[in-house]
């Protein structure tokens, strides 16, 4: 429906009233919700794009809803932390599938690789927001994993608010802080023959 009468700001992942990615105010979506999963998955990596076109469609400040949802392969060492009423059936199923496919020895590598890639995606998603003049901000789904009603293993912390060991707080603060230095460039990769 878009912004409603009486709202001081509009919290959304899309502003509406346009096609493709022109209305998006977060960089990734499920593939069923946006073409090829959104801007971050389907456009050439660059640091010169923002959400200006989307927020120009809205008469009040726009806040990005549930930005930075990037899956991290689970660390099965956390299963032993579940000692209360919650039981990690989901994690056991994932672990058993890995074992059935003779990949258990790679579990830690999968966790680390997806974790580090997730941090790069967090950074890119946040920088889209920070580059957008007049953007009202963003809210994350969560900093911790959500183990209920369908797993959302998208946090940099596990479900117990413990570090997953993939990023130090100082590093995270380097790209998610009140002041973040940004450079506007059409590419992420440059040749030594090109001028910046």
What do the PLM-derived regions correspond to, one by one?
Residues 140-196:
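Aromatic-rich peripheral "rim/lid" segments of glycoside hydrolase catalytic domains that contact
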Residues 1-157:
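Substrate-binding/catalytic cleft of secreted carbohydrate-active enzymes
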């Amino acid at each position: 429906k878009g912004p409603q009468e009486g709202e001081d700001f509009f919290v959304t992942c899309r502003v509406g009233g346009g096609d493709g990615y022109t209305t998006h105010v977060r960089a990734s979506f499920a593939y069923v919700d946006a073409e090829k999963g959104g801007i971050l998955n389907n456009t050439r990596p660059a640091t010169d794009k923002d959400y200006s076109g989307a927020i120009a469609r809205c008469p009040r400040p726009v806040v990005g809803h549930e930005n930075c949802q990037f899956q991290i392969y689970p660390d099965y060492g956390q299963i032993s932390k579940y000692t209360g009423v919650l039981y990690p059936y989901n994690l056991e199923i994932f672990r058993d599938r890995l074992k059935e496919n003779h990949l258990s020895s790679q579990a830690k590598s999968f966790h680390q690789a997806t974790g580090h890639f997730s941090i790069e995606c967090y950074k890119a998603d946040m920088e889209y927001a920070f580059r957008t003049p007049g953007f009202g901000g963003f809210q994350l789904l969560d900093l911790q994993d959500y183990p209920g009603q369908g797993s959302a293993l998208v946090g940099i912390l596990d479900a117990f608010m413990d570090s997953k060991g993939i990023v130090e707080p100082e590093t995270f603060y380097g790209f998610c802080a009140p002041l973040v230095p940004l450079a506007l460039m059409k590419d992420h990769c440059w040749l030594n023959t090109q001028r910046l």
